[in-house]
UniProtKB/Swiss-Prot annotation:
Residues 1-21 form the signal peptide. Belongs to the intercrine alpha (chemokine CxC) family. Heparin binds at residues 41-51, 62, 69, 85. Chemoattractant active on T-lymphocytes and monocytes but not neutrophils. Activates the C-X-C chemokine receptor CXCR4 to induce a rapid and transient rise in the level of intracellular calcium ions and chemotaxis. Also binds to atypical chemokine receptor ACKR3, which activates the beta-arrestin pathway and acts as a scavenger receptor for SDF-1. Acts as a positive regulator of monocyte migration and a negative regulator of monocyte adhesion via the LYN kinase. SMART domains: SCY. Its main location: secreted. A motif (Receptor activation motif) lies at residues 22-23. Keywords: Chemotaxis, Cytokine, Disulfide bond, Growth factor, Secreted, Signal. Residues 29-33 are annotated as: Receptor and heparin binding. This is Stromal cell-derived factor 1.
Length: 93
């Protein structure tokens, strides 16, 4: 074998040995893969805003009637208004 081929194979094998073995997609998945867009504000008991570097804005709501958790579409008008008020309240001087 050529020395260059052996060197390249050694580098590839070293890189494979140093990796964790799991692809990024399997090691971390976004909690909200699907969004509910028909959730009324009156049915929400609690909102949780998830801030993760690999995922878009994710909002999880606990519903009043059945205590179920659902992911809410962040594009809903009442969610946008809620976020705007929360940010204004937090950063108000």
């Amino acid at each position: 074998m050529d020395a260059k081929v052996v060197a390249v194979l050694a580098l590839v094998l070293a890189a494979l040995c140093l990796s964790d073995g799991k692809p990024v997609s399997l090691s971390y998945r976004c909690p909200c893969r699907f969004f509910e867009s028909h959730v009324a504000r009156a049915n929400v008991k609690h909102l949780k805003i998830l801030n993760t570097p690999n995922c878009a804005l994710q909002i999880v709501a606990r519903l009043k009637n059945n205590n179920r958790q659902v992911c809410i579409d962040p594009k809903l008008k009442w969610i946008q208004e809620y976020l705007e008020k929360a940010l204004n309240k937090r950063f108000k001087m």
